[in-house]
């Protein structure tokens, strides 16, 4: 998408599953004051996904950049999280540019399955074996978060970690409905010290 005048950017719209103000529950920024923009649309189709309702793009009402930015500014968060679904199915440049113009810090949560659009202060790469990440996303990731739902996923995690820039924080997170995996992740990290545990803190707190 070519970037026209700011007035044109404001009228660009996206399918929005939800927006909400809460604490970031996962990864390096867990506990931080965050405003979430959850875009509709995903064709990665993880069988254990806890956001399957976001998959069909056409099922979600569209909101303009103006509407989304107004909500984010009103929330006064420490950072804005653009998530999904798979947000990179959409051209995020108009939204990112306008949010940045308001001085907001931007975080992205992505599987990396599509090319990166927009400028972000932090990129959480959560690769999925069902649709592999674009090679170009690996050196841009600020953290790697791998979901563990079965024993074989540990091998997948190690394979993905080898593609990430040295020193990038590495997280293992249990799929929510197989919470027993937390014990296996705990034991795994004790013998693989490069990894850290990510918990879905917001779910334990019973908040969004």
Curated annotation (Swiss-Prot):
Highest taxon of the lineage: Bacteria
One GO biological process term: queuosine biosynthetic process
Residues reported to bind [4Fe-4S] cluster: 42, 46, 49
Annotated residues for binding of substrate: 23-25, 38, 83
Cofactor details (free text): Binds 1 [4Fe-4S] cluster. The cluster is coordinated with 3 cysteines and an exchangeable S-adenosyl-L-methionine.
GO MF terms, alphabetically ordered: 4 iron, 4 sulfur cluster binding; carbon-nitrogen lyase activity; magnesium ion binding; S-adenosyl-L-methionine binding
InterPro entries: 7-CO-7-deazaguanine_synth-like, Aldolase_TIM, rSAM
Cofactor(s) this protein requires: [4Fe-4S] cluster; S-adenosyl-L-methionine; Mg(2+)
Uppermost EC category: lyase
Membrane-spanning intervals of the chain: none
EC number: 4.3.99.3
Domain named Radical SAM core: residues: 29-208
Keyword Isomerase: no
Keywords, ordered alphabetically: 4Fe-4S, Iron, Iron-sulfur, Lyase, Magnesium, Metal-binding, Queuosine biosynthesis, S-adenosyl-L-methionine
Residues binding S-adenosyl-L-methionine, per UniProt: 85, 126-128
Record bears the keyword Ribosomal protein: no
Pathway(s) of this molecule: Purine metabolism; 7-cyano-7-deazaguanine biosynthesis
Catalysed reactions, as listed in the record: 6-carboxy-5,6,7,8-tetrahydropterin + H(+) = 7-carboxy-7-deazaguanine + NH4(+)
Database matches in PANTHER family: 7-CARBOXY-7-DEAZAGUANINE SYNTHASE
UniProt record similarity statement: Belongs to the radical SAM superfamily. 7-carboxy-7-deazaguanine synthase family.
Function of the protein: Catalyzes the complex heterocyclic radical-mediated conversion of 6-carboxy-5,6,7,8-tetrahydropterin (CPH4) to 7-carboxy-7-deazaguanine (CDG), a step common to the biosynthetic pathways of all 7-deazapurine-containing compounds.
This protein's name: 7-carboxy-7-deazaguanine synthase
């Amino acid at each position: 998408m070519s970037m026209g005048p700011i007035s044109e950017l404001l009228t660009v719209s996206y399918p929005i599953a939800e927006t909400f103000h809460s604490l970031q529950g996962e990864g390096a920024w867990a506990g931080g004051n965050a405003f979430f923009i959850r875009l509709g649309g995903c064709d990665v189709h993880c069988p254990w996904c806890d956001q399957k309702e976001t998959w069909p793009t056409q099922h979600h009402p569209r909101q303009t950049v103006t509407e989304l930015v107004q909500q984010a500014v009103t929330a006064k968060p420490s950072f804005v999280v653009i998530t999904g679904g798979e947000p990179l199915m959409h051209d995020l440049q108009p939204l990112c540019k306008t949010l940045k113009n308001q001085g907001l810090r931007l975080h992205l949560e992505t599987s990396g399955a599509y090319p990166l659009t927009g400028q972000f202060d932090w990129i959480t790469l959560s690769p999925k074996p069902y649709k592999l990440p674009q090679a170009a996303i690996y050196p841009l990731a600020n953290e790697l978060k791998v979901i563990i739902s079965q024993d074989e996923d540990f091998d997948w995690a190690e394979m993905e970690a080898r593609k990430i820039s040295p020193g990038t924080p590495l997280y293992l997170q249990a799929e929510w409905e197989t919470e027993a995996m937390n014990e296996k992740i705990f034991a795994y990290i004790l013998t693989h010290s490069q990894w850290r545990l990510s918990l879905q803190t917001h779910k334990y707190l019973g908040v969004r």
